[in-house]
């Protein structure tokens, strides 16, 4: 196992889910914090970052024009300080059926302007609502990524249901902190089962700050390399943004 770990390269991570963009949701409150978070991520090995501010009635409903303006400010500053870090724009969509009513507006919330959308649900969402959401998104011509799938009561209680979502066509994202056990034993147990069967498509930080929910992925990467191999670790933590969302 030591030989496998030595083959791993502990840099080049891609973070497709975080709240680093300042002033638009419950994540970074200002440009200074956003820059600190980017530096922290860079020093930890992240090289591509898709910023995904909330589209959520309680956590952030900033207008698209404001998000783009703040993104351009941050990306410009980041390019000067961290020229080899890619900064892209997406959105984390709190799923309600109304979000599919206007496909032009949905395009504004897609990952890097692609046909892929990152969707989240209430922690107590029922299985059927998630299933219907995945199918509805696919029917509109978009590809769903289910955000932090391990945070929903229905999925932690019924792991087989996550496999079903995958079979329906959804990609599965889990948070790095859940892999390393920071969100409790039952959550980690669920995630370990998914990783063992290679059900997980993306690991992301879901970072909100520089203290408790940080944009650091290297600890998780090291764990996955040790338990599940470097090839799978690279596939789910070093995604090519242009290839995935181009």
What role is predicted for each listed range?
Residues 1-84:
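An N-terminally biased module of ancient metal coordination in phosphate/nucleic-acid-related enzymes
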